[in-house]
């Protein structure tokens, strides 16, 4: 059952973690590692990289879906509040939650901390965070950068600016 979960601190699926561990060699290594601090990012980092030292950046957390947290499309589809939100998810705010502009600003501020160093870094973050940052850096729409759990992008920066990307794992 597909749920809206952003702020909810739910675990990753055990079978997903096992698959990540089996494919760990497909992921890039770095000198620095970051997570959002939510359990599923902590578990994902450990499944791929083992017990590596890392920093938690709460600014990299997914959207707080407010009243929609842990609810499915089926539960929400006929409500006026949900219909109002999905009419423009890039600008509207979830009741008692956040809107995409707030989340993106929070995510960008956290990424500025990561980018302050020129050392390579791995950030284990959420799909919405990934899509929002990629849209900001490379243009396009949110769905151009959709990721499944355990996938993402390697982004190359020069002089603090994003210049290219490739999907990971390939």
Language model: regions and residue ranges:
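Phosphate-handling substructures
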Residues: 10, 48-106
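Active-site signature of alpha/beta-hydrolase-fold catalytic machinery across serine-
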Residues: 47, 132-136
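Generic beta-sheet signal
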Residues: 31, 117-128
């Amino acid at each position: 059952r597909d749920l809206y979960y952003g702020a909810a601190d739910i675990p990753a699926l055990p079978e997903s973690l096992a698959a990540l561990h089996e494919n760990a060699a497909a992921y890039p290594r770095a000198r620095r590692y970051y997570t959002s601090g939510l359990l599923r990012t902590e578990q994902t980092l450990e499944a791929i990289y083992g017990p590596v030292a890392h920093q938690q950046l709460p600014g990299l957390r997914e959207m707080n879906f407010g009243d929609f947290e842990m609810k499915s499309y089926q539960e929400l589809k006929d409500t006026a509040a949900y219909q109002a939100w999905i009419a423009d998810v890039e600008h509207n705010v979830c009741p008692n939650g956040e809107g995409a502009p707030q989340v993106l600003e929070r995510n960008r501020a956290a990424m500025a901390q990561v980018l302050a160093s020129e050392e390579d870094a791995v950030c284990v973050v959420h799909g919405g965070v990934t899509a929002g940052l990629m849209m900001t850096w490379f243009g396009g729409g949110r769905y151009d950068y959709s990721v499944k759990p355990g996938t993402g992008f390697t982004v190359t920066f020069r002089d603090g600016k994003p210049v290219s990307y490739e999907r990971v794992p390939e």
